[in-house]
């Protein structure tokens, strides 16, 4: 084996490092405070997002996915921690809060809490099955009901670019779906994994051990990200933190294998701040790893949980 063959022995299909540094790969803007924490946005590879309980990592992930989809960039959101319906409701609510006051097709966008979605069958009237009457009813109702009105517009401007998948459990299936979409010329610009500890590899030898499974899932997600040159935002739970550690977030906080943090391009941990009030909670984004910028910085912002929205700190 010659030296050039040796150099190319484990060389990726796409020269990711060259793309990033020599060709100036631009980060994917999320138009959230994650851009500030990462000095610009999401780069191809894994960005790990962890958070203490109820700190808002799922809300931030939904906010990121919604914002990217709203700019007509495709997002694949894989979740085993939530359902398609809940993620979609949270995304519509987030979008309604961000675009409140705007008008689309004579409908004014009014923010609503994602928990306000109608779920009582007795509130739905018995309707004539005549298609023309149903169409007229739907048209009138979306002007009278803020949730239906927002959802109708969301369906046109955001939903076509956001795929929420809650029925896929292995990295093998994830890779197959993403490569199929890419082969059809519709590769996603962003992938979200919610969350890494819940997914499997599909190999019983690996999946029987929690440590080995999490390590291999993280490794395979990294390989997918690099081979497809796509940012993957991976949510991760945290291990139990000692009182003496709570003010010093680090890569060691991620639960399971150290591969979760060390295989990543960047890693951010969310903690709760002191300020809180009706419908909001101060949170802090701690940048514990960032190959494209500074580490150790803390970005303060406000979690508005009822809307799955992250706003400026004030």
For each of these PLM feature ranges, what is it?
Residues 36, 72-187, 298-300:
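Cytosolic-facing regulatory segments adjacent to core modules
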Residues 86, 100-105, 188-192, 257-261, ...:
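Glycine-rich loops and low-complexity Gly/Arg-rich segments
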Residues 1-9:
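Interdomain "pre-motor" coupling segment immediately N-terminal to P-loop NTPase/helicase cores
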Residues 266, 272-314:
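Conserved P-loop NTPase
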Residues 9-72, 76-86, 95, 164-285:
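P-loop NTPase motor core
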